[in-house]
C-alpha cells in the first residue's frame, strides 16, 4: 500500500514539475506586468498587443512564427519522403549495405548538433552557396532525416518481407507494390517520423542560426524564427512579454494535434482488432 502511494506520488510530482512552468506562463500571459517577478495584475494588454498589427513586436513575432511553420512543414515533408524511401531501400538491400546505412544514420543522431551546423556552414562556403532559405531548408532536412529513417525502420522489420515479392508475383508493378503494400504497412512509422521532424524543426536553434539567410516572410533581412527571435531579444534585454500569449497559443495548438492523433490511432487500433477478430472467426 505504501509503495503504491509513493509510486503515484512520484508520478504526480514528475507531472507537476513538467507542467507547472507552463501553467505559470499561462497565468502570467493575463498579467500586464512586463516582468513575472513584479507581481500579478490581471489584464489582457499582452493579448491585445500580440494581435495588434500596428505593434512592431507583434509583427516580429507573427513573422517569426510564419517562418518557423513554413520551414518546419516543408522540411518535414522532404525529410519524411527521403527518410521513408531510404529506409525501404535499406530494408531490401544486402546485409552489408544495411550495416553501412545504419551506421551513417546513427552518427548524426548521436553527434552534437553544433558539429552538424558547422559542417553545413563549411560545405556551403566551400561550394560558394549564398545563405538563404534553401540552405536553411537543407540544414533542417539533414537534422530530421535520420529520425524519420529510425521511425520507419522498426515498422519495416515488423512487416513480412515476402509481402512485396508476393504482390509482384500476383501481377503488381513495383510502384503498386510500394504504394499498396509497403507504404500502408509502415504508415504509423511514417506519420511518427513526420511529427518528429516538425517538432525538431520547431525547436531548433543551432542549425537555424548557422545556415539561415534572407528570404521568406523576413524579406531582405535574415530569416527570423521564434528561437532566433527570442535569442536576439535576449541580447538586448528580457524576453518580450508578448511571447507569453504566443507560447500559450502554440501549446494549445500542439495539444489539439496530439489529442486528434491519439483519437485517430485508437480508432485505427480498434478497427484492426475487430478485423482480426472477424478473420480469426
Residue spans for each PLM region:
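Generic hydrophobic transmembrane alpha-helix motif, especially the helices
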Residues: 102, 106-136, 188-192
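Interhelical loop and adjacent transmembrane-helix boundary motif
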Residues: 46-58, 202-267, 274
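Non-cytoplasmic
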Residues: 25-34, 140, 148, 189-232
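Short membrane-interfacial helix/loop motifs at transmembrane-helix boundaries
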Residues: 20-57, 212-221, 281
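C-terminal transmembrane helix and the adjacent membrane-cytosol boundary/short C-terminal tail
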Residues: 2-10, 153-164, 168, 178-181, ...
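Transmembrane-helix boundary motif in ABC transporter permease subunits
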Residues: 3-4, 73-105, 262-266
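Membrane-cytosol interface at the C-terminal ends of specific transmembrane alpha-helices
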Residues: 130-169, 176-182, 193-197
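N-terminal signal-anchor/first transmembrane alpha helix
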Residues: 1-25
Amino acid at each position: 500500500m505504501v509503495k503504491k502511494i509513493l509510486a503515484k506520488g512520484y508520478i504526480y510530482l514528475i507531472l507537476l514539475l513538467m507542467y507547472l512552468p507552463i501553467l505559470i506562463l499561462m497565468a502570467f500571459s493575463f498579467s500586464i506586468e512586463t516582468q513575472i517577478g513584479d507581481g500579478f495584475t490581471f489584464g489582457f494588454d499582452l493579448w491585445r498587443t500580440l494581435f495588434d498589427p500596428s505593434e512592431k513586436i507583434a509583427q516580429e513575432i507573427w513573422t517569426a512564427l510564419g517562418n518557423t511553420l513554413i520551414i518546419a512543414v516543408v522540411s518535414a515533408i522532404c525529410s519524411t519522403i527521403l527518410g521513408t524511401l531510404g529506409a525501404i531501400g535499406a530494408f531490401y538491400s544486402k546485409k552489408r549495405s544495411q550495416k553501412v546505412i545504419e551506421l551513417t544514420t546513427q552518427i548524426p543522431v548521436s553527434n552534437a548538433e553544433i558539429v552538424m551546423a558547422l559542417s553545413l556552414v563549411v560545405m556551403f562556403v566551400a561550394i560558394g552557396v549564398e545563405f538563404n532559405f534553401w540552405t536553411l531548408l537543407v540544414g533542417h532536412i539533414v537534422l530530421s532525416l535520420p529520425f524519420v529513417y529510425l521511425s520507419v525502420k522498426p515498422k519495416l522489420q515488423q512487416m513480412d518481407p515476402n509481402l512485396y515479392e508476393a504482390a509482384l508475383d500476383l501481377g503488381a508493378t513495383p510502384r503498386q507494390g510500394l504504394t499498396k503494400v509497403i507504404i500502408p504497412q509502415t504508415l504509423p512509422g511514417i506519420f511518427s517520423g513526420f511529427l518528429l521532424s516538425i517538432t525538431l524543426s520547431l525547436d531548433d536553434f543551432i542549425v537555424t542560426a548557422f545556415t539561415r539567410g534572407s528570404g521568406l516572410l523576413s524579406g531582405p533581412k535574415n530569416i527570423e524564427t521564434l528561437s532566433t527571435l527570442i535569442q536576439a531579444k535576449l541580447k538586448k534585454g528580457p524576453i518580450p512579454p508578448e511571447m507569453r500569449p504566443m507560447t500559450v497559443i502554440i501549446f494549445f495548438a500542439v495539444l489539439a494535434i496530439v489529442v486528434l492523433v491519439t483519437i485517430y490511432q485508437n480508432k485505427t487500433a480498434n478497427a484492426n482488432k475487430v478485423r482480426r477478430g472477424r478473420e480469426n472467426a
